[in-house]
């Protein structure tokens, strides 16, 4: 199973992420976002940021997850390539770590800046054998 794919969207970028678990799908969604920014295969997981979030539904939790990661990129130039997280659907909370390093133009390719997460086309579906997350980011 592929982890994510991009789809065309006027002036923005659509991402479809997959995972056997909800946590894996959220991780792959984040990886897709950072793949827009740089080549994540060159991002070493040497630092982490702890993340604690709550939402009112899964879509809101995903929105906050991506926005929180983009906050670290905007404020600290952190790029991420590895994610360890737990989602509690009863309390609608996400707890985890995002692993990566500070962007370095000598090591990391500068691609496209992701400005923000959006609710446009945002959906989280559970199929027979995986979760599928679809969303659009503003570039």
UniProtKB/Swiss-Prot annotation:
Ca(2+) binds at residues 12, 138-139. The keyword Cytoplasm does not apply. Signal peptide: none annotated. GO terms for biological process: tRNA splicing, via endonucleolytic cleavage and ligation. Keywords: Calcium, Metal-binding, tRNA processing. SUPFAM superfamilies: MTH1598-like. The keyword Cell division does not apply. One of its GO terms (molecular function) is calcium ion binding. Activates the tRNA-splicing ligase complex by facilitating the enzymatic turnover of catalytic subunit RtcB. Acts by promoting the guanylylation of RtcB, a key intermediate step in tRNA ligation. Can also alter the NTP specificity of RtcB such that ATP, dGTP or ITP is used efficiently. Belongs to the archease family. HAMAP family: Archease_arch. This is Protein archease. It comes from Saccharolobus islandicus (strain Y.N.15.51 / Yellowstone #2) (Sulfolobus islandicus).
